[in-house]
């Protein structure tokens, strides 16, 4: 099997990042916003792995492990916040919760 060209991989990473960014900006549900952030982090990790494989450096894989660890921590903290948010407001709509504050 041949290697994936850098341009093709970066196009996929850019599309994934754009989809995640779109999800963060458009969706108002806190859970979907959290999933969109995860997609954006995975797109960045994909770009690091591709760059590391093109230049035959292990730095891309090291950054992938770091981003994966950061994404796991962000998911745990984010889900805890989502649970508290739901218990307090009984919905996950970010705009409605900001209006309740006054």
Curated annotation (Swiss-Prot):
Bilayer-crossing regions = 6-26, 30-50, 62-82
Q: Which reaction does it catalyse?
A: a quinone + NADH + 5 H(+)(in) = a quinol + NAD(+) + 4 H(+)(out)
* Subunit (UniProt): NDH-1 is composed of 14 different subunits. Subunits NuoA, H, J, K, L, M, N constitute the membrane sector of the complex.
Q: Which UniProt keywords apply?
A: Cell inner membrane, Cell membrane, Membrane, NAD, Quinone, Translocase, Transmembrane, Transmembrane helix, Transport, Ubiquinone
Q: Look up keyword S-adenosyl-L-methionine and say if it applies.
A: no
HAMAP family per record: NDH1_NuoK (MF_01456)
Where does this protein reside within or beyond the cell?
Cell inner membrane
The protein's organism comes out as: Acinetobacter baylyi (strain ATCC 33305 / BD413 / ADP1)
EC id = 7.1.1.-
Name of the featured protein:
NADH-quinone oxidoreductase subunit K
